[in-house]
């Protein structure tokens, strides 16, 4: 019963980005540069990652 997980890392600063993109990064649980979180791979999380793909790095 292990759900598939992905690791998301913030690799670019949110300074100068849209407010909604900053909120999405916070919604993913990322707080500072090079901060990594492990999230369950759901369509909602995938959509958030796609929205801010230019700010984050994703590992399976």
Curated annotation (Swiss-Prot):
Gene Ontology cellular-component terms listed: cytosolic large ribosomal subunit
Which Pfam families does the UniProt entry name for this protein?
Ribosomal_L30
Q: Does the keyword Manganese apply?
A: no
InterPro entries, per the entry: Ribo_uL30_ferredoxin-like_sf, Ribosomal_uL30_bac-type, Ribosomal_uL30_CS, Ribosomal_uL30_ferredoxin-like
- A Gene Ontology BP annotation from the UniProt entry: translation
Q: Which CDD domains match?
A: Ribosomal_L30
Q: List the PROSITE patterns.
A: RIBOSOMAL_L30 (PS00634)
Q: Which SUPFAM superfamilies match?
A: Ribosomal protein L30p/L7e
Alphabetical keyword list: Ribonucleoprotein, Ribosomal protein
Give any GO molecular function from the UniProt entry. structural constituent of ribosome
Q: Could you give the subunit structure recorded for this chain?
A: Part of the 50S ribosomal subunit.
The Swiss-Prot or TrEMBL record describes its family as follows: Belongs to the universal ribosomal protein uL30 family.
Q: Which HAMAP family match?
A: Ribosomal_uL30_B
What is the protein's name according to its record? Large ribosomal subunit protein uL30
């Amino acid at each position: 019963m292990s759900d598939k997980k992905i690791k998301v890392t913030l690799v670019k600063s949110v300074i100068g980005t849209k407010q909604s993109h900053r909120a999405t990064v916070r919604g993913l649980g990322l707080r500072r540069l090079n901060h990594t979180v492990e999230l369950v791979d759901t369509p909602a999380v995938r959509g958030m990652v796609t929205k801010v793909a230019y700010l984050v790095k994703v590992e399976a």
